[in-house]
Amino acid sequence: MSAQTLFEKIWNAHLIRTDEDGTSLIYIDRHLVHEVTSPQAFEGLRLAGRKVRHPEATFAVPDHNVPTKDLAGGIKDPVSKLQVDTLASNCQAFGITEFGVGDLRQGVVHVMAPEQGISLPGFTMVCGDSHTATHGAFGALAFGIGTSEVEHVLATQTLMQKKPKTMLIQVEGELPAGSTAKDIILYIIGNIGTAGGTGYVLEFGGSAIQALSMEGRMTVCNMAIEAGARAGMVAVDEKTIAYVQGRPYAPKGEAWEKAVAQWQTLKSDEGAPFDAVVTLDARNIAPQVTWGTSPELVAPVDGCVPNPTDEPNGVKRGAMEKALAYMGLQAGTPMTEIAVDKVFIGSCTNSRIEDLRAAAVAVAGKKVAASIKLALVVPGTGLVKQQAEQEGLDKIFMEAGFEWREPGCSMCLAMNNDVLEPGERCASTSNRNFEGRQGKDSRTHLVSPAMAAAAAIAGHFVDIRNG
């Protein structure tokens, strides 16, 4: 058999058939569901008189609309409450496992699933959510789907897809001190652009990726969609297997040994052809800060806001000018002179225990700047929150002046109580800096947890490499 990429191995193992027009039917191993994109899908099943074909393969959690404080008073927004309540009733009616509000396992869907061992190597995984690529960190093929596709997977445990192309992104060399997985993926997007991965599944490789922890790899894969890609993935190694072992939904006993033997084959074969290859030097990756309204509009923290007049492409130049106007920034401004109003540490990109530890190191023994209106830390799940509290991280944050919240998607997107006011500027560890993403006329700068924490202390962005 000819050499295969990791993607091809998983795709071929799940391929049921390919039609004449090139559309393929593939089997789906795991389906993740949340409250926003699932109600219409369940209603479609009811109208058609269908059951969920494999309820044991679907797992649900409310996250987008869940408030992160004052939970005792319940969900006050009627639409949010309806969506959360509807998810619970649908899961009960169709026999689906749900980790509801009050369950320690509840939290952001893309933090919960790896934590529970639901995300496993070699699996196909889908969710009605853009950032499903997160689970590709496990050597899985994971991607977001639309609501009609959610219904299709619930009804059939299969999905119609066009086979994407493959791109290998090799990040070689040692990452400098102060730079993180978040900086790697922002740097990649800054290089290839938000359309650079369109039509591709990205495989992240090279020594810098191999050196990352599993949580770091999840951060990188999480933002593959922001490069326009269908999915992102990392080959299985000993770190992958060690992370999965012993988790609630991971295989046990003989099944574990059999699974590990198969998982160890989940890497691209020597000489396997990719449709595109990008090679980057990790030594060039400084801490990154986005300055515009797209993740590709990013600069090193020791750099300046770029000047659109230096951009030869007219379309890009126009986009840069529009972004600067929206963000209220002047070309040539040093990144370290950009002051922020609020700081958000959380989201499916950066709310795991390692993220919180990194942020805590940056704030320990210090105080949030008087100019900061709000600095909040939102753990990814109740279990992450519990572990952080056992390690005393909550006290470090609260003594510094941060708010320590309950799990949820929170300020990543304006779908709950945690929103920016018009014109407010936020240092955010989330994944999207689009216009209005964190609230009407909000201004979002994407950074790593340590960079966000340091900005809260200083009141503006700082180069964390300078101590």
From Swiss-Prot:
<protein>
    <recommendedName>
        <fullName>3-isopropylmalate dehydratase large subunit</fullName>
        <ecNumber>4.2.1.33</ecNumber>
    </recommendedName>
</protein>
<comment type="function">
    <text>Catalyzes the isomerization between 2-isopropylmalate and 3-isopropylmalate, via the formation of 2-isopropylmaleate.</text>
</comment>
<keyword id="KW-0408">Iron</keyword>
<feature type="binding site">
    <location>
        <position position="412"/>
    </location>
    <ligand>
        <name>[4Fe-4S] cluster</name>
    </ligand>
</feature>
<keyword id="KW-0004">4Fe-4S</keyword>
<keyword id="KW-0028">Amino-acid biosynthesis</keyword>
<dbReference type="GO" id="GO:0051539">
    <property type="term" value="F:4 iron, 4 sulfur cluster binding"/>
</dbReference>
<dbReference type="InterPro" id="IPR033941">
    <property type="entry name" value="IPMI_cat"/>
</dbReference>
<dbReference type="InterPro" id="IPR004430">
    <property type="entry name" value="3-IsopropMal_deHydase_lsu"/>
</dbReference>
<keyword id="KW-0456">Lyase</keyword>
<dbReference type="GO" id="GO:0046872">
    <property type="term" value="F:metal ion binding"/>
</dbReference>
<comment type="pathway">
    <text>Amino-acid biosynthesis; L-leucine biosynthesis; L-leucine from 3-methyl-2-oxobutanoate: step 2/4.</text>
</comment>
<keyword id="KW-0432">Leucine biosynthesis</keyword>
<keyword id="KW-0411">Iron-sulfur</keyword>
<dbReference type="InterPro" id="IPR015931">
    <property type="entry name" value="Acnase/IPM_dHydase_lsu_aba_1/3"/>
</dbReference>
<dbReference type="InterPro" id="IPR050067">
    <property type="entry name" value="IPM_dehydratase_rel_enz"/>
</dbReference>
<dbReference type="GO" id="GO:0009098">
    <property type="term" value="P:L-leucine biosynthetic process"/>
</dbReference>
<keyword id="KW-0100">Branched-chain amino acid biosynthesis</keyword>
<feature type="binding site">
    <location>
        <position position="409"/>
    </location>
    <ligand>
        <name>[4Fe-4S] cluster</name>
    </ligand>
</feature>
<keyword id="KW-0479">Metal-binding</keyword>
<dbReference type="InterPro" id="IPR018136">
    <property type="entry name" value="Aconitase_4Fe-4S_BS"/>
</dbReference>
<feature type="binding site">
    <location>
        <position position="348"/>
    </location>
    <ligand>
        <name>[4Fe-4S] cluster</name>
    </ligand>
</feature>
<dbReference type="GO" id="GO:0003861">
    <property type="term" value="F:3-isopropylmalate dehydratase activity"/>
</dbReference>
<dbReference type="Pfam" id="PF00330">
    <property type="entry name" value="Aconitase"/>
</dbReference>
<comment type="similarity">
    <text>Belongs to the aconitase/IPM isomerase family. LeuC type 1 subfamily.</text>
</comment>
<comment type="subunit">
    <text>Heterodimer of LeuC and LeuD.</text>
</comment>
<dbReference type="InterPro" id="IPR036008">
    <property type="entry name" value="Aconitase_4Fe-4S_dom"/>
</dbReference>
<dbReference type="InterPro" id="IPR001030">
    <property type="entry name" value="Acoase/IPM_deHydtase_lsu_aba"/>
</dbReference>
